[in-house]
């Protein structure tokens, strides 16, 4: 790829960031499509996010991806949010139109698209959702929009717990889905929820390096063959949760599916062009 002065910059702002496959995936897609953009990752956390956004405007970047820990904070720095992003309370994509910043969340649409592509219909189903960060709430919001019946969200009593309660209130008021929020330490409630669930989704960083030997499922007998287990973590590709699920006979969807489909939507928002899906799946080794 020969980068010229006509190229525009697209970023990814997160911390940590060096594990991300997004720069490789997006740059392969941009090169294949012959588009004058380059995509770069920047280590940005909550303490430097405001100045990074000022830099984005000053450099006239086309936009940026946003990942942990900035997804919720980023909502405060854009001029406009999509209805879905408002429901989530977090964004993973910013598009810069001559200094006017629009915030989107493609995490939810990407993850639900991966589920649908597997042939699973979420309508009328019940999901146990682990986590209450930007990715988890995006998945929950999109699932609610697309007709899931009930979401049982479990999260530790940390800084995200009250945000999870507020998220549940927004979804309950604006969709037909019923969302409950429970402390993950309540193992009795967790066991009961899994017993009646159709889908278990990990929206936390548990399983991601350096937590690759950890899983929020302590008792593998809670996993039933009829349960669909989905993962947001893609590094490592086969998380401990997915290993447990496969051993229990569950159908699984790995984190590559969400990465691929959310990235495809981001690409189209930034460039206005179709994402070269089949090519990217091939060169990245994705099976989604």
UniProtKB/Swiss-Prot annotation:
GO biological process, one term: shikimate metabolic process
The keyword NAD belongs to this UniProt entry's keyword annotation: yes
SUPFAM superfamilies given in the database record: Aminoacid dehydrogenase-like, N-terminal domain, NAD(P)-binding Rossmann-fold domains
One Pfam family from the record: Shikimate_dh_N
Catalysis performed (reactions): L-quinate + NAD(+) = 3-dehydroquinate + NADH + H(+); L-quinate + NADP(+) = 3-dehydroquinate + NADPH + H(+); shikimate + NADP(+) = 3-dehydroshikimate + NADPH + H(+); shikimate + NAD(+) = 3-dehydroshikimate + NADH + H(+)
Chain sites annotated for binding NAD(+): 132-135, 155-158, 205, 232-235, 255
Positions annotated to bind substrate: 71, 107
Matches recorded under PANTHER family: BIFUNCTIONAL 3-DEHYDROQUINATE DEHYDRATASE_SHIKIMATE DEHYDROGENASE, CHLOROPLASTIC (PTHR21089:SF1), SHIKIMATE DEHYDROGENASE (PTHR21089)
HAMAP family: Shikimate_DH_AroE, Shikimate_DH_YdiB
Record text on subunit structure and interactions: Homodimer.
Protein name as it appears in the record: Quinate/shikimate dehydrogenase
Species for this entry: Salmonella paratyphi B (strain ATCC BAA-1250 / SPB7)
